Amino acid sequence: MKNFLLFFFLSMTIASSANADGADDWQDVGFNTGILNQLNQCKGCDLRATNFIRANLSGANLSGANFIEAKLSGANLSGANFEGSSLFGANFEGANLENTSFFAANLFGVTLKEAWLIGADLRQADLSKADLTLANLTGANLTNANLRGAILNGTIFCNTKTPWGIDNSSCE
């Protein structure tokens, strides 16, 4: 019921159009997190293949949600909670993910090029085959994260707790 109310509210406040591929298009939308809080936000929502390019979802509770193949490039997701969410193949290129929780989330094959993951919680996250080219992981926690096959070209690991046990606390 809460998910229905959330989507009803969103459909009443924004014009949501469908792309040719059937994905919802909420590009450039600023969501009122106060309203999302009243509706228990979007815990467990199915938002696969949705277009959230440059959307503002800062502080949103999206734990357990399905964002498979979602487009979130340039989005502001600072302080959001994606704990246990499925984000397989999602695109976060250039997104602000500062202090975002991805604890135990499935991030297999995601694009995180040039994303800001400063202070992010990536403990036990599956980042296998993820593209972290030029991503900033300063102060992030990657304890027990899976980075098998991940692309780490130019990734910043300053003061980061890595899965291989290094905290990089001496970097400047």
Name each region found by the language model.
Residues 1-4:
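Positively charged n-region of N-terminal signal peptides that target proteins for export
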Residues 21-172:
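Tandem repeat scaffolds
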Residues 7-13:
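Bacterial N-terminal signal peptides
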Residues 15-17:
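N-terminal signal peptide c-region/cleavage motif recognized by signal peptidases
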